[in-house]
Amino acid sequence: MADTGLLISHAFDEKTIQGDELYQKLMLDKLEINSGMLVENIVAQMFVASGHRLYFYSNNSRTNADDRMEIDFLVEKPQLTNAHNICPVEVKSGKNYTTVSLNKFCKKFERQLFTPYIIHGMDMKIDNGIVYLPIYMTSLL
């Protein structure tokens, strides 16, 4: 879904929450919603608007926990540099989160990766080779 407003309106049963009530809950940060879904949709929309194709990675291995991981987006670098042109991107909507899948992915595919990113609602930083970007900087990737 490329329209975040349309996504929000479809996420709620019209009989459950009326327009004014939805607006008030949204403005007062009291909306009970899977914010991860919403933020991932916003990031996907920003990637598409910036000309990126949307790719993701998912492995639900039942036999090997080390292979079990999911990466929200895989972004290609415009130029191939020593086969390191894939940037894994994880989107985090909360303040407290883990990077288990991203760490596993980086370890498994380190020869093909350029820079791993985490898009989150906090300030920019670089920690252990991972670039943490605020959501509004997504379009700069």
Question: Where would I find each of the regions flagged by the language model?
Answer:
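A cross-kingdom feature that marks ATP-driven nucleic-acid transaction machinery
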Residues: 1-141
